[in-house]
Amino acid sequence: MSAISLINSGVAWFVAAAVLAFLFSFQKALSGWIAGIGGAVGSLYTAAAGFTVLTGAVGVSGALSLVSYDVQISPLNAIWLITLGLCGLFVSLYNIDWHRHAQVKCNGLQINMLMAAAVCAVIASNLGMFVVMAEIMALCAVFLTSNSKEGKLWFALGRLGTLLLAIACWLLWQRYGTLDLRLLDMRMQQLPLGSDIWLLGVIGFGLLAGIIPLHGWVPQAHANASAPAAALFSTVVMKIGLLGILTLSLLGGNAPLWWGIALLVLGMITAFVGGLYALMEHNIQRLLAYHTLENIGIILLGLGAGVTGIALEQPALIARGLVGGLYHLLNHSLFKSVLFLGAGSVWFRTGHRDIEKLGGIGKKMPVISIAMLVGLMAMAALPPLNGFAGEWVIYQSFFKLSNSGAFVARLLGPLLAVGLAITGALAVMCMAKVYGVTFLGAPRTKEAENATCAPLLMSVSVVALAICCVIGGVAAPWLLPMLSAAVPLPLEPANTTVSQPMITLLLIACPLLPFIIMAICKGDRLPSRSRGAAWVCGYDHEKSMVITAHGFAMPVKQALAPVLKLRKWLNPVSLVPGWQCEGSALLFRRMALVELAVLVVIIVSRGA
């Protein structure tokens, strides 16, 4: 099958699964199976289409028969298709067992519609259609939030972003007479894109991507959403915003230097602040949401380095920046899916998202515990996992930036490298905090003490994603050259070689070798050891003796108190009078439903 045929089949499966899951929503278990199987098949088709184009290194175009509009799949957006397909596959399988929980509501309609709209946005050949599909995707996500308050904030900020994007599209039409991306690219080679339109696009798509300070909806939406929904927010919805920013920045291939510098600065702020705020959180899903912001910033650093390379006409910098950013985009989606789905498995068995109420989960849920450890290590960019591989290439782009001709680039290169290293240290602290407080020590509540293993499909999905994280790190020397085909600019191969991180991975991982040998040699002697209670100065062990998440983060909280005080100023809710009114939440939800219905009718009528 051709890539276009695969995409048509994938979108058809998503839509069919959404409709059937809604029709059978009166039977929750059956609805879950329909949504899960249909979503998994649609995701497989989507990933296959992306893989076909990426390995072929040649873009294809055609029509999406369901809605009758032109689409294009380039090696660049093929990476988004692979990311959506892989994450959607395991989220869909996980979602089948998720429906077994008594407190869970049917979500097959929203999840599969979100996936279908996201795929259509990625392959859109027209910027206007891109914005419309991204809007449908965001509205589906609004209805996946746990309650009206979170959905209200997302809806309000989303409409602001859509308004800015609509203005940008209108200005593009006025200046270039088209919204077709291929025609825009050709015409902008003669008449470059204006910075006013670029700024509107960056703010509009930045609201969707969650770039700080445009991130207000991100922690609230993730905090109490279902695990499958939170995983899709992080791995699908926010990534579409990054695609929009990159698409605008690459049009015409003549970006000015300050665009790249602006993306680098925004990326560094987002990465550092996101990592810092994550360390202060105790709700595991809100914590992971802030870490998503951190990784959005890291991806933006890579993309910004690539755009800076375009302005400076440095092919090596373009290759390192874009390849590093794109590889980290894929890797982040994998390990963040592990973490959100793993956290959801813990909630499924304990009913708690507050890590202060957990503890000792590692003994109760060993499979999830090991998978979460892999995901947390990848999040902290520890070798030999995929999180390290992507960041290593981004570090290389900073080294190349330091050797460029522009003074501001030479100045930023070392500063960004140091800033990313500090952000990595915060991520390591957060990894130790989450795993230590949640999975080690003694249980702090009866629910944690009585936890049992997660259902089969949930465990399989989390473990499979964790294995993908290992493969993404170990197989980086073979995967990175494939991504070079996604760089949408003509480059000289001799000047764009990306240093493969395998040797560095192995060297850094060498200290683990003695521990592995010791575990193998002494494994048979461990059961014969006698065990007894630890000496605690004559007192019996109490639950209060275990280190808490609050205590773990206290030194950093005291050292960086001025930065943490900015949180209330970065929260848009505090700036809007009357926002907390109970009636406004229901009003916004109804407005979202009306807008979604209108957009769906318009899209369907185009294909009729």
Regions found by a protein language model. Name each.
Residues 57-66, 182-186, 393-408, 478-498:
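Membrane-interfacial helical/loop segments at transmembrane boundaries in membrane proteins
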Residues 18-22, 275, 434, 513-523, ...:
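Alpha-helical transmembrane segments
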Residues 2-6, 68-77, 128, 184-191, ...:
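Interfacial loop-to-helix junctions that mark the boundaries of transmembrane helices
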Residues 90-100, 105-130, 139-450:
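Hydrophobic transmembrane alpha-helices and their helix-loop junctions in integral membrane proteins
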Residues 37-50, 161-169, 372-384, 461-478, ...:
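Hydrophobic alpha-helical membrane-insertion segments
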Residues 479-505, 521-608:
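Aromatic-capped, Gly/Pro-kinked transmembrane alpha-helices
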Residues 28-39, 152-159, 285, 289, ...:
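Alpha-helical transmembrane segments and their helix-start/interface "positive-inside/aromatic belt" motifs
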Residues 1-9, 16-109, 177-189, 485, ...:
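Transmembrane helix-loop-helix hairpins at membrane boundaries of multipass inner-membrane proteins
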